[in-house]
Amino acid sequence: MYCPQCGHQTDGGNFCEKCGSPLPGQSGHQHAAQTGAAAKQAAKQFGSFVLSVLKRPYQECKATGGEQLISAIITMVLFSLLTPLMFYILFSDGPGSVSFTAIFLEPTIYFILFLFGLHACIFFALKIAGNQVSFKDSFSRFGAFLIPFTAILILALFFFLLHTDICFTILAVGLIGAFFAIPPAMLSSYQHSYKGKVDFIYSTIVIYLIICVTFQLIIEHYVKEIFRYMLF
């Protein structure tokens, strides 16, 4: 190994025997350590943010801005994974064959796309109401509002693993609560900058119609898979 500073050949170690400069292996180790420390700090910040939102959901969410973008993305992905995971585990326990793609992967993608679409509808409603909010800020706040409902879905998964029937009631509360409570909560959190061009009530009604159509498509997908699973 040659020192990158003075060119002296060395048999190894952390530093050059001649000039004392750090050898490349040490730099790589430091970079890995820095990456690990950054990941640990990010996880700590996410956990702290989640706890603060769970303690005071609306107050914390309405103060959330673009600085929580990563937390919003993590929450959205986690929310999208939980329901398909429950159904995949449910079908896997039976005697029939289970399609990982149809039961878990595709619904997860549908959930992610739906959440993006739901936020896009809310963002559009805010814009036509005259709010000068950025997409990054509104998306981060949307992810913050998802946190309590993601916690409910985690609770549903916990009871599901304990084989209790109440898990599906909790699941319904988490899903219906998220899809029908977040839009008015989001719109209300920006009411201080409302310019009165379009009333929030009408925006909420349109968003609810889109949600109902999407719910119908998701239910039809799972009903088809259930019949396919039972028949084949």
From Swiss-Prot:
<protein>
    <recommendedName>
        <fullName>Uncharacterized protein YvbI</fullName>
    </recommendedName>
</protein>
<keyword id="KW-0812">Transmembrane</keyword>
<feature type="transmembrane region" description="Helical">
    <location>
        <begin position="139"/>
        <end position="161"/>
    </location>
</feature>
<keyword id="KW-1003">Cell membrane</keyword>
<feature type="transmembrane region" description="Helical">
    <location>
        <begin position="104"/>
        <end position="126"/>
    </location>
</feature>
<dbReference type="GO" id="GO:0005886">
    <property type="term" value="C:plasma membrane"/>
</dbReference>
<feature type="transmembrane region" description="Helical">
    <location>
        <begin position="69"/>
        <end position="91"/>
    </location>
</feature>
<keyword id="KW-1133">Transmembrane helix</keyword>
<keyword id="KW-0472">Membrane</keyword>
<feature type="transmembrane region" description="Helical">
    <location>
        <begin position="200"/>
        <end position="219"/>
    </location>
</feature>
<feature type="transmembrane region" description="Helical">
    <location>
        <begin position="166"/>
        <end position="188"/>
    </location>
</feature>
